Amino acid sequence: MTLWVLGLNHQTAPVDLRERAAFAGDALPRALESLRALPQVSEAALLSTCNRTELYAMAEEAHSLVTWLETHAPALSGYLYQHQEAEAVRHLFRVATGLDSMVLGEPQILGQVKDAWAVARAHGTLGSGLDRLFQQTFSVAKRARTDTRVGANPVSVASTAVRLAQDSFARLNESTVLLIGAGETIELAAKHLSEGRVRRLLIANRTLAHAQTLASQHGGFALPLTDLERHLAEADVVFSATAAREPLVTRAQVEQALRARKRKPMLLFDLAVPRDIEASVGELSDAYLYTVDDLERAVEDNRRGRREAADQAEAIIDLQVARYVETLQANARQAPLKRLRAFGDSTRDELLAKARQQLHNGKPADEVLEQLAHALTNRLLHPPTAALRDAALNNDLELTTAADRLFPEKPGLPTSPHSYPDREDR
């Protein structure tokens, strides 16, 4: 099996395609199990965020992964990237460190990678290969962020959106802000808003208790999601980031809110993928809609300023990729030896148990020992004997040369391993 990563992100696909390829809520474990069920796949993990959807798999080839993803979201092939082996390792290290993020060095992605690992592990789609890779990824990301300033004073998509709101509303502290959701992105937005002060903070969420917790931390008011439409007209600024599969805020709702506000402008930030706010809201006069793709331009200055730290982190990743691949190669070289030892041990234990039973049944010891010796010799030598016989028929000089090194001629031994009789156990 080969290590593959297949995916699309904010650099290769626009938000409307990314939302089609997103796996949110209960869809993620179902998708994982479906992916792992493919005969070509032995291990699988799925990373799905607002900016990327990526499949990590131990698979025979990549075509089956592409076909599977396009079954979920058609017409993606022109927007996909794929990496294998060392380049797949490098890609995951860079993603977890924040080097492949829209906001360079943003810290949320490491937690999202850990969540992807935890979900895959909980649903039994990880094996030793991917599990080892993710564990090493966490270690590399921690080191890169500790040894460089790539994660210093991080700028998130949420903080960028809040800054834009502050720039757009000279007196944001006199405005009412509505937050939809209670996940990490909304938590960050609430934190930045409470630091800058707003007149009134409303937090709407499907699970009211989560909204109440967030509201108590930041001096806001919690609302059930069912009350969203009723309070929409009160909001000067809206931030939304949920895992809903369908838009929560429609064009009709915003039109109605604008009429109730007597056309007073509204600023809306849709930080979710799939999107929470209907795209056509941006066509309304007095409604100003920003998506995560719009925010990419706003964070470009931050990206340039953090490039030096990113270069240092890239150097750490290069070194860690080389070490990880070297370890994998060393393990691969050891694998045949481990299989050989395991085969020898299991054969010995099986035949020894059989011999002990024969002695217990009263069979003469000399006869038991002779049968044990013959059976052990034949069982251990049958696989190499058969392989060497095929090599001789196929003129496989590489294998016969290796056999000469493994079985050198010595006094008292046959001149060639081919001369061992291929007898069955008695």
From Swiss-Prot:
Keywords on record: NADP, Oxidoreductase, Porphyrin biosynthesis
Catalytic activity: (S)-4-amino-5-oxopentanoate + tRNA(Glu) + NADP(+) = L-glutamyl-tRNA(Glu) + NADPH + H(+)
GO terms (BP aspect): protoporphyrinogen IX biosynthetic process from glutamate
Ranges where the record places region Disordered: 404-426
Record-linked Gene3D superfamilies: Glutamyl-tRNA reductase, N-terminal domain, NAD(P)-binding Rossmann-like Domain
Residues holding substrate: 49-52, 101, 106-108, 112
Binding site for NADP(+): 181-186
Its EC number(s): 1.2.1.70
Active site location: 50
Assembly mode: Homodimer.
Other noteworthy facts: During catalysis, the active site Cys acts as a nucleophile attacking the alpha-carbonyl group of tRNA-bound glutamate with the formation of a thioester intermediate between enzyme and glutamate, and the concomitant release of tRNA(Glu). The thioester intermediate is finally reduced by direct hydride transfer from NADPH, to form the product GSA.
Protein name: Glutamyl-tRNA reductase
